Amino acid sequence: MGMYKYIREAWKSPKKSYVGELLKKRMIQWRRDPVVKRIERPTRLDRARSLGYQAKQGYVVVRVRVRRGGRKRPRWKGGRKPSKMGMVKYSPKKSLQWIAEEKAARKFPNLEVLNSYWVGEDGMYKWFEVIMVDPHHPVIKSDPKIAWIAGKAHKGRVFRGLTSAGKRSRGLLNKGKGAEKVRPSIRAHQGKGK
């Protein structure tokens, strides 16, 4: 097996492999770190490479922490019975991974989100690593594999649900029977697709 295959096998079931112990130690530090933190290199090199990361100028990797669980809605100030406050049992329409990508994009407005992947979770948080690209960097513009991201159509792509996590949340990875109401969008079908 090649190096990347060993890494992939270890990350398939982190608790059973050496990755579990590593994650325990790393998360102690991760909890103290800021919500969005730029890192030197990817934690999961195999996953990052398969999602388009290259170790060259113009690529940035960011680790993002997201609170687990349903959406925390703002509490009403006016009077009403507790059951009608609309506080609980409301889940967000976005996945936590998509939310993590948006957090990274807001922190680095000059970069575009390419992709992201899971790196860990505990009882309270989930961590994702987001691969970001500088669309104005000459190295990116001259690379035919990634130069497409510099086009106008991809500006703010994460906020329009054009990343893999966004498309998955919008139901666009489903095809055929049962997916009639997700294209061109859920809004176009009055929200019946979700």
From Swiss-Prot:
Annotated segments matching region Disordered: 168-194
Entry-linked PROSITE patterns: RIBOSOMAL_L15E
Keywords of the record: Ribonucleoprotein, Ribosomal protein
GO annotations of cellular component type: cytosolic large ribosomal subunit
Intrachain disulfide bonds: none
One Gene Ontology term of the molecular function aspect: structural constituent of ribosome
Chain segments annotated as transmembrane: none
Pfam families: Ribosomal_L15e
Gene3D superfamilies, sorted: Ribosomal protein l15e (3.40.1120.10)
Name of the protein: Large ribosomal subunit protein eL15
Gene expressing this chain: rpl15e
